[in-house]
C-alpha cells in the first residue's frame, strides 16, 4: 500500500486564480456572469449554474483547445481542476512502470457522461486514446456531439453504449483489447432521496434557488445506484478479475475515506497484486482514487512492451 500527500498536482494548469480577463476573451459569454466579492475582487457567480457552465466552457476552450462544448440541462457540470488532477495522478501511476509517462496509452472511462470531461483533458494533455462507456443514451449523444464538434477528437475518443445496467466492463472491453488503465467517477448515493438531500445541502451552501441545483445537478445514474458507492465499486472489483490480463491498472474515485476499508478487503479477496491510493485536494475539497492491478512488476513491464 502506498499513498501520496494531498495537494493540487504540479502539472495541473489550474494552480493559480482564474485569469478572468483571458477567459472572457476566449469565451465572451462568461462576461455576463462576473460578479464582485465582498472584498471588491472580480469573481464568477458560482451560485448560478449557468455561470459555472460558462466557466467550464471557457476553461476547456482556453486550456484544452475544446472550442465547442455544451451539456444538456440536468447533467453534471464537473469542476475542471479536480478532473484534471485525476488525469495527472493517473499519468504518474502509469509512468512508474517504465520511468516515463506513456504517450500512446489506451484508457477506458467508465461512465463518460454528457460532459466527456476526462477524455477531453487526457487526450489534450498526454495524447491518450480513450474509450468512454455510458449507460444513458442522452449522455452518450451529448458526449458524441462534443467529439464531433471539435476537430481531431474523433481520432482520440470513441464511445460505447453499456446496454446491460448490471455490468461495468462486460460488453465494453472486447476480446483482444488492452487498456493501460480504467478510470471512473462512480455514483456515490444509495438512493434518489439521498442524492436529492445532497443536492439540497449544496444548494443551501451556495445560496442557490431551489430550482437552480436541478439545472446541472446531475442525472440519477450519475449520482446514485442501489447500495451506493461501496456496492458499485465492489462490483467493479469483482468484475475486474475477468479482465485481469487485459487491463494494467483499474482505478476509481472514492468519495469518502470511510469507504476504503471494505474496498481494501474486497481487493484482497480477489487477489489484487498491488493496490495504490492517491490523495488529492482542490481547495477545501479532499478526494482520492484507488488503483489496483493483478500483475506484478515484471508482468506490468511485459504488458507495456508487448502493447507497444
Curated annotation (Swiss-Prot):
It is an enzyme of class 2 (transferase). Keywords: Cytoplasm, Methyltransferase, rRNA processing, S-adenosyl-L-methionine, Transferase. It catalyses: adenosine(1618) in 23S rRNA + S-adenosyl-L-methionine = N(6)-methyladenosine(1618) in 23S rRNA + S-adenosyl-L-homocysteine + H(+). It comes from the Bacteria. InterPro entries: METTL16/RlmF, rRNA_lsu_MeTfrase_F, SAM-dependent_MTases_sf. One of its GO terms (cellular component) is cytoplasm. GO terms for molecular function: 23S rRNA (adenine(1618)-N(6))-methyltransferase activity. GO terms for biological process: rRNA base methylation. Pfam families: Methyltransf_10. Its EC number is 2.1.1.181. It is found in: Cytoplasm. Belongs to the methyltransferase superfamily. METTL16/RlmF family. Specifically methylates the adenine in position 1618 of 23S rRNA. This is Ribosomal RNA large subunit methyltransferase F. It comes from Salmonella arizonae (strain ATCC BAA-731 / CDC346-86 / RSK2980).
